[in-house]
Amino acid sequence: MQKLIIHGGKPLEGSINISGAKNAVLPIMAASILTNKLHITNVPKLTDVSTMKDLLRNHGACIRIIEHTDEFELIINTTNINKFTADYEIVRKMRASIWVLGPLLTKYGKAKVSLPGGCAIGARQVDLHIAVLKSMGAEIEIEDGYINASSKGRLKGTHFIFDKVSVGATINAILAAVLAKGETVLFNCGREPEIVDLCYCLIKMGADILGVGSSTITIKGKDCLNETSYKVLSDRIEAGTYMFAAAITKGDVKICGIDYNIIENIALKLIETGIKVVQINNGVQVTYKGKLNSVDLETNPYPGFATDLQAQFMSLMSISSGVSMITENIFENRFMHVPELCRMGADIVVRGNKAVVRGVEMLKGAEVMASDLRASVSLILAGLSTNSKTVLHRIYHLDRGFQDLEKKLSNCGANIKRV
C-alpha cells in the first residue's frame, strides 16, 4: 500500500495553480443524464471523478476523455441510458453517487440507487433527499440497502422546506426539479459556490432557475434540456488547504486561478491569525509575518467556514501561540484526525463537537494514518511544519480530492514523495 514520506522544516515559496472543484464537477457530471450531451472542461484528475465516470458508464453513458497536462475534458453522451440501477460496488466508493437519483427519476421515472459510501465522517443520512423527491410525487422505498424510486408520469413541482441546510439534498432536488412539471420552490437551500456552479451549468442547458446563490431557489420545470459545454469553477477547498500550507510552513505562496470571492472567508480567518493575505490578479498571496495567533473557529454552511477545511485549520492552530476552540457544527464525527495530530505532539482535547487546541512550539514527525480525505491533508500540513520525518499511511483517501498534491507542494520547495 502506498504512503507519503514528508521531511518538514522548509518554508513553501512559489505559486500553486488550483484545479477544478471536485464538489462542483461531480453533480455537473450527474446532470449530464438530463440532456443528450454535455462537454465539461477544467475537470480535475481525481479518483472520485473516475468513480463518477464508471457510474455513468454503468448506466449506459458514452464518455470521451480529452487529457491535458493539468485537467481533463469530458464529453458525456447520455442518449443511450439503459440501466437505472446504481450498484453497491460503485456507490460504496463515493457518497456523491446519490446525485444520479434525481436525474434518473425525473427523466426516466425510475431509479434504484444503493445507499452511499464515501468518507467515514458522520451519518449524513439520505432522509432529506427522499423527503423532497416524495414531495414531487415520487414513490420511494428503501429495500435491501437500496433506494428504490419511481414516479407515475413526470415529477411535479413542489414547495419544500429543508429542515436543515443540506448541500447534497439541495443538489438532488435541483437536478430533479429542472424537468419536473410546474414550479418548484426550495427553501433553506445550501448556498455553496458548487451549488451555484451547478445552477449556472443547468441554466446554460436551458433550465429556468431563479434565486441562484440564495437560500430560496425557484425552478420552473422544462420538457427537456439542451446540449452545452461548461467550465467547472476552481476548488476553494484546495485553495484554502494550500493557503494554510503556506502559513504553517512560515512560507510565501501565491495561490492562483481562484475567485477571491469564494475564498474571502478563508482569507479573513487567516488574517485574524496574523498571516498576511493579499488579493492578487487571479488569486491571493499568503505570507507568514513572524507570529501565528490562536483564534476560535466554527464550521457552518456557506458563507460560513467550510467543514472541509476544519482539519487543516486545526493543524495550523496546533502550533499557534495560545488556545483556540474549534467547533464542528456540520458532521458529528469529524475529529478523527485529532489522535494522529496528538501523536505528532499536538495538545488537543475533544469535548463533544468542540476541540480545545493549545498551541505548541513545534510538532514532531511520526508515523500517522489518514482516516478520511480532509484528515489526510491536515496530517500532511502538520508534517510539513516539523523539522523531522513524517510517514502518512492510507493515502488513497488523498487521491479522491487532491490532484497532483505532491507535485504542487514539491514545486514550492516541500520534501514529499510517494512510495
Swiss-Prot record:
* GO MF entry, a single one: UDP-N-acetylglucosamine 1-carboxyvinyltransferase activity
Name the source's superkingdom.
Bacteria
Primary residence:
cytoplasm
What this protein is reported to do is described as: Cell wall formation. Adds enolpyruvyl to UDP-N-acetylglucosamine.
Annotated EC: 2.5.1.7
Q: Which Pfam families match?
A: EPSP_synthase
Entry annotation: catalytic residues: C119
- HAMAP family from the entry? MurA (MF_00111)
The answer to whether the entry has keyword Membrane is no
* PTM annotation (2-(S-cysteinyl)pyruvic acid O-phosphothioketal): residues: C119
Gene designation:
murA
Q: What family classification does the UniProt entry report for this protein?
A: Belongs to the EPSP synthase family. MurA subfamily.
Q: Which UniProt keywords apply?
A: Cell cycle, Cell division, Cell shape, Cell wall biogenesis/degradation, Cytoplasm, Peptidoglycan synthesis, Pyruvate, Transferase
Recorded protein name is: UDP-N-acetylglucosamine 1-carboxyvinyltransferase
Identify the SUPFAM superfamilies for this entry. EPT/RTPC-like
Q: Which reaction does it catalyse?
A: phosphoenolpyruvate + UDP-N-acetyl-alpha-D-glucosamine = UDP-N-acetyl-3-O-(1-carboxyvinyl)-alpha-D-glucosamine + phosphate
Annotated positions binding UDP-N-acetyl-alpha-D-glucosamine: R95, K164, V165, S166, V167, D308, I330
